[in-house]
Design a protein with these regions (language model features):
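Structural signal for beta-propeller blades
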Residues: 68-71, 113-115, 158-161, 211-213, ...
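Short loop/turn segments immediately following the C-termini of beta-strands
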Residues: 65-66, 110, 155-156, 165, ...
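Residue position within the beta-strands of beta-propeller blades
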Residues: 61-63, 107-108, 152, 205, ...
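A short helix->beta-strand "capping" segment at the edge of beta-propeller domains
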Residues: 30-46
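Asp-box/WD-like beta-propeller blade repeats and closely related beta-sheet repeat scaffolds
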Residues: 112-149, 153, 157
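Blade-level signature of beta-propeller repeat domains, shared across WD40, Kelch, NHL, RCC1
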Residues: 292-347
Length: 347
């Protein structure tokens, strides 16, 4: 009887302890992932959405990386407004943005190794930035500083190019070039998304193949020595910075948006991949590429490139954990995520 009584007491104590643990407000803390919702499905035939930018009026511009020369323009509710055919161009379009001062619509033509000025109504294009030697370049993403200068990442040369507010012709020397902006990893893209902190004193650059964010100190428009800011963002792709200097990064190999503070401490991991519908449409994030905020900053829009790396790199052996899923995609999407998230408790 004493042994039974002791067992009962022990069981009661264990259960009480477990109940207390489970009821503790911080015991089950986890990332509040803010489910990625469908914003828009590209029209039939539209594939590989990569670049994304929100216009001053709130419209969402989405560039395709499929050779079609297409940019799709959606309203803030995801309704298709028009389809632009960017001409002349190679059709392999990546980063895009609206100049904060001139309001020029700039689009990277990856295939031609240049940056274009594009008419946002007609799609007519002209050169904005050209390189003296475009062969071997990998122009990918762009951003602006307070003076209106334009900065363009080069994934293959491990560099960032710079022009003034009106562009440049025949650039020969990158603004900065460094081994930390190159990669031998996978996906095989080095310098990618980039953005300045609010003080304009640091340019942050994602390195996709290295899973890193690199910080470049800036003084008087001149680049300092790059250094690794933070590691382990799986496939760090597009990158933007909010008004609190938090850094939002599309992690294209883990199908999530990673948010860090200005010290590199992770604050949130948002979104996830939730499989495909019967018609081959992704639920949630699948190879998220380029994020941007809505005008009121309450929503994050992000393209789902859904790229099969075996096809994208031309190497059948280049299998990623999402390859079997991306191979089944029939309809490409843009997602939206609520930017208000519950921060983890910080004891």
């Amino acid at each position: 009887m004493r042994r039974l009584t002791a067992c009962v007491k022990a069981t009661i104590l264990i259960c009480a302890g477990l109940a207390g643990f489970l009821s503790h407000p911080h015991s089950a803390a986890a990332f509040d992932r803010n489910k990625a919702q469908l914003f828009a499905v590209l029209p039939d035939g539209g594939t590989l959405p990569e670049g994304l930018a929100v216009a001053p009026n709130g419209d969402v511009y989405v560039a395709t990386f499929d050779g079609s020369k297409k940019i799709f323009v959606f309203n803030e509710n995801g309704g298709l407004l028009r389809t632009l055919t960017v001409n002349p161009s190679s059709g392999f379009l990546l980063g895009l943005g609206f100049h904060p001062q001139t309001h020029a619509f700039l689009v990277i033509d990856f295939g031609a190794g240049k940056v274009l000025t594009v008419d946002p109504q007609s799609g007519g294009a002209s050169d904005f930035i050209t390189l003296a030697t475009p062969a071997g370049s990998g122009l990918n993403a762009l951003t602006f500083d307070a003076a209106g200068s334009v900065y363009v990442s080069d994934s293959f040369k491990g560099a960032v190019w710079k022009s003034g507010p009106t562009g440049a012709s025949g650039l020969t020397t990158p603004w900065v070039q460094n081994v930390l902006l190159t990669t031998t990893g996978d996906p095989p893209f080095g310098a990618n998304g980039l953005a300045f902190n609010k003080a304009g004193s640091i340019l942050f650059v994602a390195n996709t193949g290295n899973d890193t964010i690199v910080q470049i100190p800036v003084s008087g428009g001149t680049a300092g020595t790059p250094a690794v800011f933070v590691n382990s963002i799986n496939g760090a792709d597009g990158l933007i910075i909010d008004d609190q200097d938090n850094i939002w990064v599309a992690a294209n190999q883990s199908d999530e948006i990673v948010v860090t503070d200005n010290t590199g401490k992770v604050l949130a991991k948002l979104g996830d991949f939730d499989g495909l519908t019967k018609d081959g449409t992704p639920n949630g994030l699948l190879f998220p590429a380029s994020p941007d905020f809505s005008r009121d900053k309450k929503t994050l829009f992000v393209t789902n490139l859904a790229l099969d790396l075996r096809v994208g790199t031309g190497n059948p052996a280049n299998v990623a954990i999402d390859s079997a899923w991306t191979a089944q995609v029939k309809h490409w999407t843009v997602s939206k995520i609520n930017t208000q998230f519950q921060a983890l408790p910080n004891k």
